[in-house]
Swiss-Prot record:
Pfam families from the UniProt entry: BACK, Beta-prop_ATRN-LZTR1, BTB
PANTHER family in the cross-refs: KELCH-LIKE PROTEIN 36, LD33804P
Biological or metabolic pathway of the protein: Protein modification; protein ubiquitination
Domain BACK stretches: 147-249
Domain BTB: 45-112
Protein name: Kelch-like protein 36
Positions of Kelch repeats: 294-343, 344-395, 396-442, 444-491, 492-544, 545-593
Role played: Probable substrate-specific adapter of an E3 ubiquitin-protein ligase complex which mediates the ubiquitination and subsequent proteasomal degradation of target proteins.
Species whose genome carries this gene: Mus musculus (Mouse)
Transmembrane segments: none
Length: 613
C-alpha cells in the first residue's frame, strides 16, 4: 500500500463478531440492461444468429441460459458451438428478433401480425415462457370465427393449455357452433367425442346432441366407420320412452345405414327404462346426468312447537348463495335417513309425526330420480326405523339400528335394487339408536348412540364388513355422544357434535367437540370444535368440505338454520348460506341434478362472462 494511503489509526483486531448479508434487488435487471446495451452496440457478442439472410447478434451464455435448444447446441459438441454465425431453419426473422429482444428486455409485444411467427420461434427454441405468453394472448382472442384455426395451431405445437381453453370455449358455445358448416366439416372425430361425452356441454336437451352426432356422421361417407364411437357418447337412457321410439329411433333409421346398428343403443335404453326398480345398479356413462353434483337437504322438523314436518328437498345454488327447492317428498318426514345410490336419492324410515319417540316410526323407502324428477315407492324395510343410519355401499343400501314402537333396535338389513327386497344381515352387538355412521373404503362405521338404558351416551366405534358379514369393535371415541354426525373425508372419519347426559343429573348438554379417526392407525385426534350446537343435523361432504346443516341445541332448546362448513386443511369451521328455516331431524346428501333450462342458460352465460367473452 502506498504511503499516502496508509491508515493513521491501526485496525482493531475485530470490528464486529456479527455478519450481515446485503442484497441488491435490482441486480439481475441491471445486468440484463447492460447486456442489452452491449448487444445493441455490438460489444462482446460471440454469436450471430442468421435467418432469412438477416442477422441477430447475441451472447451465447444468455441464449444457453434461457433456451434448452441453445443450451444443447452449445454444450453437446455440435459444430454450431464453434461457429461465429449459426443459421437457423424453421423460423422467421420477425419471430427470432422478437424472441431474442425478449430475452434481453423481458418485454414481449404480441399482436395479430406477429403472434404466429413468435409462437413458431419460441416453440422451436424451447423458450416456454414465451410460449405461455402466446397462449395467454390467444386465449383472449378465441372467437366463433377463429377457434378452429387456433385449435389446429394448438395441435401443431402441442399447446395443451390453449387446447383445453378452446375445448372449454366450444363446450360453452356448443349449441351455436355445432350446427355450423365449419364445425360439421372440420371438427375431428376425436374432438367431437370429447364434446359429446362431456358433462359440461351446452345443450337444451339430449336430442340436440344426437342431431349433431347424426349430422356429423352423414357429412362424409367415410365417417360411417365412426358410428359406434360417436353414438356411444349420446346418453340414450335420458330420453323418455316415447321420444326414444317415436323420434330417436326414426332419426337413426332414416339417416344411418342398417349395418351401422344404431338401433342397439335404443334397445339398450329401452331395457334400462323397463327395469325401473333396478336402475340404480344399471348405471353406465350413458345414464349419467350432464350436470355437477349439488348439496341437498331433505325433510326435517321445521319448528319445535308448531308440530310441523317438512317435505322440502332443496339444493344449494352456489352462484346466488341460496337454497332452491328441487322437489317435494311423497310424505313429510323427520329423523329419517337419506342415501344416494347410482345417482338416485333414497329416503328411508323416519318419523311421520312430531312424536319422535319411535311410536311414529316408518319403514317406507322412496326413491327419487333426478333425471325425470320423479319419486317412486320401492320395497319397505322389514322393520320400522327412526333415529337410525342408512348407507349406500356397492350395489345395496344398509339400514343400521334405530328404534320404533317396540324400543331400540339392534337389527341390520340390506336393500338390493336388483331384487327390490330387504334382507337381514348380522345385527349390532347391542341395541342402538341416536348413533351416527359413515362409509370408509367399503366398510360401514357407526359410533355413539344410546340403547334406552339409563346413563350417558356411548363412545363405541363399530366397523362392519359386508363381505364377511361381521361387526368389529374399534378404538372408542374420546367423547361420548349421540344425535351427532359422522362423515368421511380424505383418510379420516369425523365424529361431529351431538349431545350427552350428565352422569349425576341426567340433564342433556351439547357437545361441540369434533374428533377425527384414522382407520389406518386406529387412533382418534381432536380437531377444531363446532361454532354452535348441532344435534340431529344433516351432514354431507361436498367439494372437499364437510357441511353440517341445521340441528338442535339441548341447552338452549332451539332449532338452528345455520350451515357450518369445515375445511380440514385449515382445521377451521365457517358459516355457509343459512337454511330457509330453522330445522332439525334433517338429512343431507350430494347428488347430480337435472338443471332447469333457464339455469342452463344462466350457467352458460356466467361461464362466458367469467372468460371475458
Amino acid at each position: 500500500m502506498e504511503a499516502s494511503k496508509q491508515m493513521r489509526v491501526s485496525r482493531p483486531y475485530k470490528i464486529s463478531e456479527s455478519s450481515k448479508v446485503y442484497h441488491w434487488p435490482d441486480h439481475s435487471t441491471a445486468v440484463l440492461q447492460r447486456l442489452n446495451e452491449q448487444r445493441l452496440h455490438g460489444l462482446f457478442c460471440d454469436v450471430v444468429l442468421v435467418v432469412e439472410e438477416q442477422q441477430v447478434p447475441a451472447h451465447r451464455n444468455l441464449l444457453a441460459v434461457c433456451s434448452d435448444y441453445f443450451n444443447s447446441m452449445f454444450t453437446l459438441g455440435m459444430r454450431e458451438a464453434f461457429q461465429k454465425e449459426v443459421e437457423l431453419v424453421g423460423t422467421s426473422y420477425v419471430g427470432l428478433k422478437a424472441v431474442v429482444d425478449f430475452l434481453y428486455s423481458s418485454e414481449l409485444e404480441l399482436d395479430g401480425s406477429n403472434i404466429d411467427y413468435i409462437l413458431e420461434t419460441a416453440h422451436l427454441l424451447q423458450i416456454w415462457t414465451v410460449v405461455d405468453f402466446c397462449c395467454e394472448y390467444l386465449e383472449q382472442e378465441v372467437s366463433e370465427d377463429n377457434y378452429l384455426y387456433l385449435q389446429e395451431l394448438a395441435s401443431i405445437y402441442s399447446l395443451k393449455r390453449l387446447d383445453a381453453f378452446i375445448d372449454s370455449f366450444v363446450l360453452s358455445h356448443f349449441s351455436t357452433l355445432s350446427f355450423t358448416p365449419d364445425f360439421l366439416q372440420s371438427i375431428s372425430v376425436q374432438k367431437l367425442c370429447v364434446y359429446l361425452s362431456s358433462g359440461q356441454v351446452q345443450h337444451k336437451w339430449e336430442y340436440d346432441l344426437l342431431q349433431v352426432a347424426l349430422q356429423w356422421l352423414t357429412q362424409q361417407p367415410e365417417r360411417e366407420v365412426h358410428t359406434r364411437r360417436v353414438l356411444e357418447n349420446i346418453r340414450f337412457p335420458l330420453f323418455p320412452e316415447d321420444i326414444l321410439l317415436q323420434r330417436v329411433k326414426l332419426a337413426m333409421c332414416s339417416l344411418l345405414p342398417s349395418e351401422a346398428n344404431g338401433e342397439g343403443f335404443v334397445e339398450e335404453a329401452m331395457h334400462y327404462h323397463n327395469s325401473l326398480v333396478a336402475q340404480p345398479v344399471l348405471q353406465t356413462k350413458r345414464t349419467l346426468l350432464r350436470s355437477e353434483e349439488c348439496l341437498l337437504f331433505v325433510g326435517g322438523e321445521v319448528s319445535e312447537r308448531c308440530l310441523e314436518l317438512s317435505d322440502d328437498t332443496c339444493y344449494l345454488d352456489t352462484k346466488n348463495e341460496q337454497w332452491v327447492k328441487e322437489t317435494s317428498l311423497p310424505a313429510r318426514r323427520s329423523h329419517h335417513c337419506v342415501a344416494v345410490l347410482g345417482g338416485f336419492i333414497f329416503i328411508a324410515g323416519g318419523s311421520f309425526s312430531r312424536d319422535n319417540g319411535g311410536n311414529a316410526a316408518s319403514n317406507l323407502l322412496y326413491r327419487y330420480d333426478p333425471r325425470r324428477k320423479q319419486w317412486i315407492k320401492v320395497a319397505s324395510m322389514n322393520q320400522r326405523r327412526v333415529d337410525f343410519y342408512l348407507a349406500s355401499i356397492e350395489d345395496m343400501l344398509v339400514a343400521v339400528g334405530g328404534r320404533n314402537e317396540n324400543g331400540a333396535l339392534s337389527s341390520v338389513e340390506t336393500y338390493s335394487p336388483k331384487t327390490n327386497s330387504w334382507t337381514y344381515v348380522a345385527g349390532l352387538p347391542r341395541f342402538t339408536y341416536g348413533h351416527a355412521g359413515t362409509i370408509y373404503k367399503d366398510f360401514v362405521y357407526i359410533s355413539g348412540g344410546h340403547d334406552y338404558q339409563i346413563g350417558p351416551y356411548r363412545k363405541n366405534l363399530l366397523c362392519y364388513d359386508h363381505r364377511t358379514d361381521v361387526w368389529e369393535e374399534r378404538r372408542p371415541m374420546t367423547t361420548a355422544r349421540g344425535w351427532h354426525s359422522m362423515c368421511s373425508l380424505g383418510d379420516s372419519i369425523y365424529s361431529i357434535g351431538g349431545s350427552d347426559d350428565h352422569m349425576e343429573s341426567m340433564e342433556r348438554f351439547d357437545v361441540l367437540g369434533v374428533e377425527a379417526y384414522s382407520p389406518q392407525c386406529n387412533q382418534w385426534t381432536r380437531v377444531a370444535p363446532l361454532l354452535q350446537a348441532n344435534s340431529e343435523s344433516g351432514v354431507a361432504v361436498w367439494q372437499g368440505r364437510i357441511y353440517i346443516l341445521g340441528g338442535y341445541s339441548w341447552e338452549s332448546t332451539a332449532f338452528s338454520r345455520a350451515v357450518q362448513v369445515y375445511d380440514s386443511e385449515a382445521n377451521r369451521w365457517s358459516r355457509g348460506p343459512d337454511l330457509p328455516n330453522a330445522i332439525a331431524g334433517v338429512s343431507a346428501c350430494v347428488c347430480a341434478l337435472n338443471p332447469r333450462l333457464e339455469e342452463k342458460k344462466k350457467r352458460n352465460k356466467d361461464k362466458c362472462q367469467d372468460r371475458g367473452q
